[in-house]
Regions:
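Conserved beta-hairpin
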Residues: 58-61, 67-85, 259-291
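A short, internal acetyl-CoA/4′-phosphopantetheine-binding micro-motif in the GNAT/acyltransferase core
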Residues: 98-108, 142, 302-317
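Short amphipathic alpha-helix that is part of the acyltransferase structural core
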Residues: 1-59, 72-74, 210-255, 374
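Active-site/acyl-donor-binding loops of N-acyltransferases
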Residues: 2-4, 151-212, 329-374
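Anionic, Ser/Thr-rich low-complexity intrinsically disordered regions
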Residues: 11, 16-23, 28-31, 38-41, ...
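A conserved beta-turn-beta hairpin within the catalytic core of GNAT-like acetyltransferases
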Residues: 87-98, 106, 131-133, 294-306
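Conserved acetyl-CoA-binding loop-helix of GNAT-fold acetyltransferases
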Residues: 107-124, 313-330
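Intrinsically disordered, low-complexity terminal tails and inter-domain linkers enriched
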Residues: 4-11, 15, 126-174, 206-223, ...
Length: 374
């Protein structure tokens, strides 16, 4: 397939950006402009899963801080594909890349043309000192139970109790698998390799045996305390954990940024608990923590961030995470994110999945291309 875009310049007015020869004719590339999301939805259809729904949100008008460039591919004047590349202030080592082509227009080289043009824009910005790298990362779901329609949840809609039609999880999985196969082949052909796996997992209530909680009957039991999401101590713990599990994509997350991006009011953080080796009043340190992003208990699993002190040894970290998770799911289900880099949590979750006490809602893979980095 042909599809390499020629040398291109950026046009802030949203006019013709460049043209590219593809199988079956030629396409026009131009900057993203208002209304493109609706026009593309007509040819793309609804996203196949929750991950694709999230990734489509990357597509937006160009910006300088954070730096972003988005292009739309038109065939015969009709938008059929789009792509975006943008920089993250928290993870400066690589730029995010997302490209999507209408199903009827795939295998014509349109995606390749978009990637080539976006790489060119990144190279220009890097040469001008606007961004620190041209290395890229992209992600896609290999499996999913959660559809791409906002508000749909397989946990609460399998029986139609919400008034919406039940989620057809088999259809979601089938569509996701088909899309993933094509996406992975495309990324590999573009020089990308896998670097990380990230899963959103729902854990059933009572899935883990409860530990003894410190009290008169159990003076050596675990110490569980509530913590303010504005706490400096909690924010420092979250920052240390985040940095430790992102060694594969190093972060520049300051304590202030962690408070804003992970714990602040805009995140929806509704409360937190910490597991200590002794009461705080006695100088006890945080061994593990959980931050809830669900304001009230409900039938659907609460969205929770679980982390631990990265200075703990493997055995101690495993125990701290198991104890905290057991207390979290004592009565209600939760859903958590677990990455390959989160070894203690991944080990526990894999055991729960194997015992049918947990299930994967979305299974996402991250691929990278570092060949053109800084």
């Amino acid at each position: 397939m042909t599809g390499a875009a020629g040398a291109a310049g950026h046009d802030d007015g949203g006019a013709l950006f460049d043209s590219a020869a593809v199988v079956g004719g030629e396409i026009v590339l131009r900057p993203w402009r208002p209304g493109d999301d609706l026009a593309l939805l007509e040819v793309w259809g609804d996203p196949a899963n929750a991950q694709q729904h999230q990734d489509r949100a990357m597509l937006a008008e160009d910006a300088e801080r954070p730096w972003r460039r988005a292009l739309v591919a038109e065939a015969a004047g009709v938008p059929v594909a789009a792509g975006v590349v943008y920089a993250s202030s928290v993870h400066p080592r690589r730029l995010w890349l997302y490209v999507e082509t209408a199903a009827a227009e795939r295998r014509r080289g349109i995606g390749r043309a978009l990637v080539a043009a976006l790489r060119g824009l990144a190279a220009e910005a890097h040469a001008a000192g606007a961004i620190p790298t041209t290395a890229l990362k992209a992600r896609f779901a290999k499996d999913a139970l959660v559809p791409g329609v906002a508000g749909a949840d397989p946990q609460t809609e399998t029986d139609g109790a919400t008034g919406r039609p039940p989620v057809d999880t088999d259809a979601v999985r089938s569509q996701t698998a088909a899309l993933a196969a094509g996406t992975e082949a495309f990324l590999v052909a573009e020089g990308f390799t896998p670097v990380q796996r990230s899963r959103r997992v729902a854990i059933a209530p009572g899935a883990i045996g409860l530990p003894d909680v410190r009290g008169e009957e159990h003076p050596d039991g675990v110490v569980l305390e509530e913590a303010s999401t504005g706490s400096v101590e909690l924010t420092q713990a979250v920052t240390a954990f985040y940095d430790a599990v992102h060694a594969w994509d190093p972060s520049t997350l300051s304590v202030g940024a962690a408070q804003q991006l992970l714990l602040g009011p805009a995140t929806g953080a509704a409360g937190a608990v910490v597991l200590r080796d002794a009461p705080k009043a006695e100088g006890g340190r945080i061994r593990a923590f959980a931050v809830s992003y669900t304001p009230e208990r409900q039938d659907a699993p609460a969205d929770v961030l679980v982390g631990w002190d990265p200075e703990l040894g493997e055995k101690d970290a495993l125990q701290a995470v198991a104890d905290l998770l057991a207390l979290l799911v004592a009565q209600y289900p939760v859903q958590i994110e677990v990455d390959e880099a989160m070894a203690p949590l991944e080990r526990i979750v894999d055991g729960l999945i194997g015992g049918n006490a947990a299930r994967t809602l979305v299974d996402t893979y991250v691929f990278v291309d570092d060949t053109t980095g800084a």
